[in-house]
């Protein structure tokens, strides 16, 4: 944890003050550029102070990305923070989801930016497409849904948790396949299964889409770290990756 003096020293930097001012004005792109330039040559202690400053100001992507830059001294509560903890934990429990998996997925999807938008049109903490969100809202009886509400953490988490539960159920509760499906679609995740069972790590390495391959790796690694930070299930990454069923068994499960 950075000292009060270290925090004050980083907060006094002109570049940091400009970055924070830009964030307050809602100029996220310009603010991020200024932030990155300011922290580019910082040592570990200064980086942790900058990450803590971002945490105090609720700039969660900078908290994570800045803490991730340290080389020898690490603070995993900054690398793996728990913003919107009550909202996300409530929905995880409601859908019987592993909380570290939910936080690990959100960390990768949006870096906890509640109004994040992707180039593909996905929105919010759990990066839902409006069409998917609208369909889920109808299923769960969410009234007066419109896509502008996807920026509200409680709405996005409720819809996203339902969808994550849906893809998990479609793959026998396997988080590796669920993560692949969440990113690339259930059909693709299923088509990448081998005829015979294989180790989860091998399945991940054979995903043909580089983006999805890296996404699954990061979500699963995030899950392990969040479990450690949150005091949950301490299984290793290898254990969590598990074994992927063969394609025929997968097809049979899908038809049940």
Where are these regions (language model features)?
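Catalytic glycan-binding domains that act on GlcNAc-containing polysaccharides
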Residues: 1-9, 15-18, 25-256
